[in-house]
Amino acid sequence: MAISDQVPTGSDFHAKSTAAEVLSGFDLTGKTAIVTGGYSGLGLETVRALASKGAAVIVPVRTPAKAEAALADVKGNITMAAMDLADIASVRTFADDFNATHTQLDFLINNAGIMACQQARVGEGWESQFGVNHMGHFALAQSLMPLLERSQDTRVVALSSTGHKISDIRWDDLHYDAADYDKWQAYGQAKTANALFANALSRRLRATGGHAFSVHPGGIFTPLQRHLPKEEMIALGWLGDDGEPSELAKAGFKSPEQGASTTLWAATSGALNGKAGVYCEDCDIAIPTDLDSPTARFMGVNAHACDDESAERLWELSEKLLSSA
């Protein structure tokens, strides 16, 4: 796929649609889903919605006590299993256990992530946002690949964001070994990587009718902002001087229930059949960014996040990085 494939489907859903509305009429009994980050924010709402429709949902957890408390009131067939995206060995152990106990995987929702955190290293010295948001999920998909390839019509959804507009992949200095660390640029690189991952994976699932998509869920107040001081969120316009959501945020931000809707639309919509690898927002395929529009910063997808050659280059690079982990 390429930027020219970013053509909306004319979806009946929109920016304010909720997870429940998107899944209305679906019966997911007999389906199996993995949702990373499934015990807070968007992930929790994604788990809630899938389970309410009968899907068996497996939630990888880094902090079991927190996960148990968050999922306690969620009804349905939900299982927790230990995994830390910053620890590739734990990712492989989770996947090995899943492969040994399951014969299909219908939905892989790569929801977990970190944003604009202070400089840190994970894995084999990887910059943490690239390491957690991309490499951890890449390792998970690689370890689950035999099952993904055997499962008919599987869907993989990678949560990117409008943050991809901040930065392309920093091919010559992925981990800020040479340049000064920029937490927002690093976040942008990771979100571009999420989109390119879905692009490349979609080609690898084609033989069995599988699809992979990336999505921008929208602006939502979730634990993702935990690394940002209040002063920075005020400067960004997300909060007013009183520390409460600004008028801009009230008008443009979504609730977690609304934020989960695009993920679930990408996971289930028949309108996306044959359109693997596209980037979605507001429950439809996103249009290319209109650089002359006042909404260019917030809407649409940039060409660097839809480039096939970059997607394959990142896949090969990620395989090399993973081989040493």
Predicted regions and their residues:
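C-terminal helical subdomain
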Residues: 9-11, 91, 190, 239-297, ...
